[in-house]
Amino acid sequence: MRRLFTSESVTEGHPDKMADQISDAILDAIIEQDPKARVAVETLLTTGVAIVAGEVTTKAYVDVQDIVRKTVLDIGYTRAKYGFDGETCAVLSSIHSQSPDIALGVNEAAEFKQGDKAEDEIEKVGAGDQGMMFGYATNETEELMPLPIMLAHKLAMKLAEVRKNGTVPFLRPDGKTQVTIEYDENEKPVRVDTVLISTQHEPDVTIPEIREALVKYVINPIIPENLRDDNMKILVNPTGRFVLGGPSADTGLTGRKIIVDTYGGAIPHGGGAFSGKDPTKVDRSAHYFARYVAKNVVAAGLADKFMIQVAYAIGVARPVSIMINTFGTAKVDEEKLRKVVEEIFDFRPGAIIKKLDLLRPIYRKTAAYGHFGRNDPDFTWERTDMVRELKAAFNL
């Protein structure tokens, strides 16, 4: 049976993504000076105000107000009529240190309190919280990501690009994209059914003008010719007007675009957000590692689709459970595949941080256009450097 599946993305000027970028810009500034800092920073944006709150334990000093303003201005909110102005907005900060009760479990995992020996200081790290994290990969795109979310991200990136470089001069920073893909009976994407773009714009431009520009400069360069047909629907600003945007139109909050950040709804989500969190928080680091595992399994040709769920207890280094699902696409025995994954990959938070080199100021750029499927050497969880080991485990 054929089916339709839809995913959305948003531009860097969307209020929730602004909040994510501010939180991660603060994290980067701290971790650059103090890689072992503990950071959990949330941002709320509304008309004329940015509020930053959270828990930070660090030896570093950072100018929160300056970081907020520079991030907002870099996104493109340089005038109040756009819905926010980085120069004139109020910035309120309420940051305190990490709870000592939480620090007890993160600084020294439960296993080592019970007498186990740590091979290495960093492997003493316990999970910063309980929860479950999911990783996924599919061979339907070269990025080994679901096609709907990849196209939605690419449209959103192109929308921001043509705004910033002046190709489409009447655009403003806020915007959203959405792509509906038709899949055939074999779960292969066969066509784009619907493309939706809602973009903030100057007040004196008409919808036909916006549509013409977006089709020419955004949609045509991104949507592959082989996935188009005469029945493909294009929707541009279907409300008819999108002049007021940004935090003046909608309150922005860190962690409210977790499906955009991951796989566009193609698989479950454990609920934990990424931005503003240092890598001892498994909400972030274990999600990255789960993607790393899934991508390597699919890249090795062991399955066409691969999902993994990993679950943790706060203060405990080793996961409480690991579950895999190949959706019937495994090329090897699935039970053996699970065992091989558990043997080859070390899911302890300290080992994850070490393997993926996560104690670096790399997070601001993850905070818009997806954390996965990106071609950037700093996104170490996108490497496929475990393919040889995985194949060897199956004598391939």
From Swiss-Prot:
Residues 98-108 are annotated as: Flexible loop. GO terms for biological process: one-carbon metabolic process; S-adenosylmethionine biosynthetic process. This is S-adenosylmethionine synthase. It comes from the Bacteria. K(+) binds at residue 42. Its cofactor is Mg(2+); K(+). GO terms for cellular component: cytoplasm. ATP binds at residues 14, 174-176, 241-242, 250, 256-257, 273, 277. It catalyses: L-methionine + ATP + H2O = S-adenosyl-L-methionine + phosphate + diphosphate. Catalyzes the formation of S-adenosylmethionine (AdoMet) from methionine and ATP. The overall synthetic reaction is composed of two sequential steps, AdoMet formation and the subsequent tripolyphosphate hydrolysis which occurs prior to release of AdoMet from the enzyme. Its main location: cytoplasm. It comes from Fervidobacterium nodosum (strain ATCC 35602 / DSM 5306 / Rt17-B1). Homotetramer; dimer of dimers. The gene is metK. Pathway: Amino-acid biosynthesis; S-adenosyl-L-methionine biosynthesis; S-adenosyl-L-methionine from L-methionine: step 1/1. Belongs to the AdoMet synthase family.
